[in-house]
Design a protein with these regions (language model features):
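Residues lining hydrophobic/aromatic ligand-binding pockets adjacent to catalytic sites
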Residues: 1-135
């Protein structure tokens, strides 16, 4: 299960594994108060995308589309969240004041959709398979 929580809200034992999912540390929050298990800077939207969006709800649909494209190109950035969620609860920690239009909400949606998609495997022809070291 993947849940969301603002960085300014109290930590709870039911949060499970806590991931800060932004490139920037939340203003005015100490490491001791935030108590995240992992800071996944690279899972946050690119600086260019974050600045373009600027938490403008009018841009929400286009932001999601662009952010999903970024996430699709870097699965290694968000795999730790999926792994933690399979073992229990994972909480995405974010700092935005808007609880409906922020990158953590979009990330949660992306991860839910990704978990429903079947894995894609690329078939390798015999000519391109690595050679075995066996005779």
């Amino acid at each position: 299960m993947i849940t969301l929580k603002r960085a300014y809200d109290s930590v709870s034992p039911t949060d499970g594994r806590r991931f800060l999912v932004e490139r920037l540390w939340p203003r005015g929050v100490s490491k001791a108060k935030l108590r995240v298990d992992t800071w996944l800077k690279d899972v946050g939207p690119s600086t260019e995308l974050r600045k373009w969006f600027s938490h403008d709800p009018v841009k929400w649909s286009e932001f999601r589309r662009r952010y999903f494209r970024e996430l699709s190109s870097q699965p290694e950035a968000w795999r730790p969240i999926v792994s933690a969620a399979r073992r229990g609860r994972a909480t995405l920690v974010y700092s935005s004041h808007d609880t409906h239009h922020n990158s953590a909400v979009a990330l949660q949606e992306f991860l839910r959709k990704s978990s429903r998609r079947p894995a894609k495997f690329k078939r390798t022809s015999a000519a391109h398979r690595p050679r075995s070291s066996l005779p």
